[in-house]
Curated annotation (Swiss-Prot):
Family matches, as InterPro entries: Ferrochelatase, Ferrochelatase_AS, Ferrochelatase_C, Ferrochelatase_N
Source superkingdom: Bacteria
Reaction it catalyzes: heme b + 2 H(+) = protoporphyrin IX + Fe(2+)
Entry binding sites for Fe cation: H214, E295
Identification of the protein by name: Ferrochelatase
EC number of the protein: 4.98.1.1
Record has Aminoacyl-tRNA synthetase as a keyword: no
Similarity comment text for this entry: Belongs to the ferrochelatase family.
């Protein structure tokens, strides 16, 4: 409902209201693959206390003394391998922008809804897009962290950043945070359909399907983070929908960082062992990633595939994320329409 401005006094400040914003938020991306861009991005990411929960007195000497001097070049080279050279940006940025534009198209029947997108780290920032939506007249905003499974290091830090922006605003928009959807029927069906469609293009059948999720330190799980349990449930529902058994389907965890123990089994170690044990054909899907990014395109499609072949494997397939495809957008639209109820 658009506000009635007819009764305002002539000297009333110009304001817009009556709109509802939808803000899609993903992890983030560097602006380029060069050292400076990578260091700036990694600094913001690795100083987030939700991501690295160590005391700054312990972590910062390591971060600023070692990590930020060595890791930008290494990670920059990895990004170069999967960089969208046509648009000169990461594919995560490309897909997230596309998802926002497609969502706006899908919701065009809702005249008061405005759709935008942001990144937790890097640009466009959450704060800048909340401000932009407010300037467009959005006095209510649905904040959608694009993570099917909840984790403090992903979903919670998006929410933190949004509420941090609200602290600085005189006229705060009402904010509705979107919960996880790890066991949503439409989501599971979209994953299963993606697996079936991709495997149908192969001239071989995998002996094992791995569902590889981003890992978190084991200590986070022990402190009450529900992420591990939600990943396991997503995996179980996907396995049951595909009609697979525990003998040919596994949930694994990737992307560990630092000396701590992380959720297991580790994807890289599992891929090596499967090949060494005589498994010749495997496929990997990343159900926890809404869009393909460094962790899927380089870590799985490149590194894991290479490791599998180096250790005796013969056939390796990486199943793309749902990205901005029709099935993936159906999932996101269902969640958004559900969360808009009562506001439109």
């Amino acid at each position: 409902m658009t506000a009635d401005t007819s009764l305002r006094p002539a000297d009333h400040p110009a304001v817009k209201s009556g709109k509802v914003g939808v803000l899609l938020v993903n992890l983030g991306t560097p602006d380029g693959t060069d050292y400076t861009s990578m260091r700036r991005y990694l600094r913001e990411f690795l100083t987030d206390r939700r991501v690295i929960e160590w005391s700054p007195w312990k972590w910062y000497p390591i971060l600023f003394g070692v990590v930020l001097n060595t890791r930008p070049r290494k990670v920059g080279k990895a990004y170069e391998l999967i960089w969208n050279k046509e648009k000169n940006e990461s594919y995560l940025r490309t897909y997230t922008r596309n998802q926002s534009e497609l969502m706006a198209e899908h919701l065009k029947d809702l005249a008061t809804v405005k759709v935008d997108w942001a990144m937790r780290y890097g640009t466009p920032s959450i704060a800048s897009r909340i401000e932009a939506l407010k300037q467009e007249g959005c006095d209510r905003i649905v904040l959608f962290p694009l993570y099917p499974q909840y984790a403090a290091a992903t979903t919670a830090t998006v929410n933190d950043k949004a509420f941090q922006k609200l602290l600085s605003m005189r006229w705060q928009p009402a904010l509705r945070t979107v919960p996880d959807y790890h066991d949503d029927e439409t989501y599971i069906e979209a994953l299963a359909t993606s697996v079936e469609k991709h495997l149908a293009t192969l001239d071989w059948k995998p002996e094992m399907l791995l569902a590889s999720f981003h890992g978190i330190p084991m200590s986070y799980f022990k402190q009450g983070d529900p992420y591990y349990c939600q990943c396991q449930k997503t995996g179980r529902l996907l396995r049951e929908r595909l009609g697979l058994t525990k003998e040919n389907f596994m949930v694994t965890f990737q992307s560990r960082f630092g000396p701590e123990e992380w959720l297991q089994p580790y994807t890289d170690k599992t891929v090596e062992k499967l090949a060494q044990d005589g498994v010749k054909r495997i496929a990997v899907i990343n159900p926890g990633f809404v869009s393909d990014c460094l962790e899927t395109l380089e870590e799985i499609a490149e590194q894991a595939a290479h490791s599998f072949h180096e250790n005796g494997g013969e056939k390796f397939a990486h199943i793309p994320c749902l990205n901005d495809g029709e099935d993936g957008m159906t999932v996101l639209e269902k969640v958004v329409r559900r969360e808009l109820q009562g506001w439109i």
